[in-house]
Amino acid sequence: MKKIHFSLLMLAIVVICTSCKREPQPMAYITSHLNVPITLYNEKDSVFLAPMQRTYLCDVEVENGKFTHCGGVNWTFCVFDPVIKIALLDTTYTVPEQYQLFLADVDSYMYHLSYSSSSSSPVKYESSCYDYVLRPDFVKEILRGAVANK
């Protein structure tokens, strides 16, 4: 009888230890190409721009304190001083500036070639257009409940 109790105890320890070694599952898995609806809002003109459904979240490479590379361009728009909002988990969030990366900071950019969501043809934009990248840690902050909706 003692052998049976000992065997059951050992089996329980093995099962518990095996389950301890499993990687904890995150609340939501953030991929590098998460599909997040984006709304761009031009506060000056009170105009909502059409959301682009495909949004690229990417890891940021910084060299000497300067942004150098992203895995994909998130969205392009041609208005000044927009308020960027994202819709996630049925809630809209305003994206703080520290979570945005401003890409159009090179004076030599006369235009930017981009692909529209409805066509595979490149579209030429004037120099007043900007590319923004949403830092993935902002979405992680939302998912862990650290960001209030606005």
Predicted segment positions?
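Short, surface-exposed beta-strand/beta-hairpin micro-motifs centered on an aromatic residue
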Residues: 54-58
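Sec-dependent bacterial lipoprotein signal peptides
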Residues: 1-21
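A short tyrosine-centered beta-strand micro-motif
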Residues: 65-67
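Intrinsically disordered, low-complexity segments enriched in small/polar residues
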Residues: 20-29, 45-48, 59-61, 70-150
